[in-house]
Amino acid sequence: MALTISRAQYVATYGPTVGDKVRLGDTNLWATIEQDLLTKGDECKFGGGKSVRDGMAQSGTATRDNPNVLDFVITNVMIIDARLGIIKADIGIRDGRIVGIGQAGNPDTMDNVTPNMIIGASTEVHNGVHLIATAGGIDTHIHFICPQQAQHAIESGVTTLIGGGTGPADGTHATTCTPGAWYMEHMFQAAEALPVNVGFFGKGNCSTLDPLREQIEAGALGLKIHEDWGATPAVIDSALKVADEMDIQVAIHTDTLNESGFLEDTMKAIDGRVIHTFHTEGAGGGHAPDIIKAAMYSNVLPASTNPTRPFTKNTIDEHLDMLMVCHHLDKRVPEDVAFADSRIRPETIAAEDILHDMGVFSIMSSDSQAMGRIGEVVIRTWQTADKMKMQRGELGNEGNDNFRIKRYIAKYTINPAIAHGIAEHIGSLEVGKIADIVLWKPMFFGVKPEVVIKKGFISYAKMGDPNASIPTPQPVFYRPMYGAQGLATAQTAVFFVSQAAEKADIRAKFGLHKETIAVKGCRNVGKKDLVHNDVTPNITVDAERYEVRVDGELITCEPVDSVPLGQRYFLF
């Protein structure tokens, strides 16, 4: 006999369903559930008097020898994902990977159970009611200056760090390069202790090929070209030749001073080959004043770093001070001051907001401790989305913010994964991928996750007093969980390396315990492959006034005095 309950009662018990709108934090963004994969009346819920019990929603006979039995299931959760959309489902995990998005349960007693989502006695359950699940974030612009960055990253919902460095050396303060085989080995060994996935860039600044090849063979998943080492046409060509040969990505911070050529010369050196441009607006560095034009090319994968996101009344002043420190400039030297002033342009920063909203800029990253904040990639992405809704109105005619939400979440999940040849493994919650999952309460979305799951094991979470009688008494703050302890760290995070390094078995050579996964397909991608962010309009920049035009139309916006997801979330 069917039981009819009110929509309000259903939402209170099982969470929102199709058509329900959920506000993201204190932004003005509302996500509407597009599809519900659960069977009404057969929802799985754990707890006293609930349905996940032996013989009910939990099988009384299925053992883990059955490959369809889950290790971990998140039930009744709202999913926000660039590829899956905004849906309601159970998430099934086995052996550290997502094996099902659908209906979990006991097929002996329930209809429509997804075939490989059986709940058994060996299954752990987490209630996803009133939570939002997203894929772990990917930050592709990491200066590995200190190991403590990883903690701040994972606490913000970022689970993969890609970049370079060797610690607080001046070369690392300024550039994201791990130079040479010796440092590559030692940085992999050091990163064994980090609770996040890691990939390292080699130093791409070399006009001959062998010094680049040896870094790729030692484990670098890509090469980074930086102007501080000389971003010349010869260097660019050499790095891209090695990239094409060894199937890795090249990231570039172009020549702010235009010493060895202008943007047109850099694009000529790139010669149509795919490349990942960092801080493509230019405040973080790059051809002044028109590096932003690079975003119009189909072979360019354009990224932002987060300090310019979004454009606020404090953005300009903050950048001048940051720049002087990060690039070892002296306020007493006129040439250094001129260098700094040439990079910080309100006009192009304002345009960057709009280019993100149009889907022209495709990736968001941090520039950690080197003119960017590792813990604010997610926050600033959603602050930008909210500002653009306020200033530009709705995108599309859906009557909700779903398209804008999917466009923006793609910028720090699936698109950086595509750019670096790791989308087969991370970047979305699709079946088959590593179960790096972030769970949020809607009111804290984008700011403070409830739980961060790494490879199917809870690694970080909000946790109260460990001596309390229940988990919730204050002080509540982020603490490492069992997935980030002891030998488990090596089982819950991976290293992304080149195919050459995988073939050379650097895991055994360096004595590593974490799984190494080779990147692939880095040279076959283009702007067209970047999800919801593949637009390639004509962009022009006025060389004197710095005004930016897209297809002939001036694009600009005002800085704001305040942003959501701000101080009210950080009083304690």
Swiss-Prot record:
The active site is at H327 (proton donor). The keyword Hydrolase applies. Its cofactor is Ni cation. Its EC number is 3.5.1.5. Ni(2+) 1 binds at H141, H143, K224, D367. Residues 136-572 form the Urease domain. Substrate binds at H226. The keyword Lipid biosynthesis does not apply. Ni(2+) 2 binds at K224, H253, H279. Carboxylation allows a single lysine to coordinate two nickel ions. One of its GO terms (cellular component) is cytoplasm. Keywords: Cytoplasm, Hydrolase, Metal-binding, Nickel. GO terms for biological process: urea catabolic process. It is an enzyme of class 3 (hydrolase). HAMAP family: Urease_alpha. This is Urease subunit alpha. It comes from Haemophilus influenzae (strain PittGG).
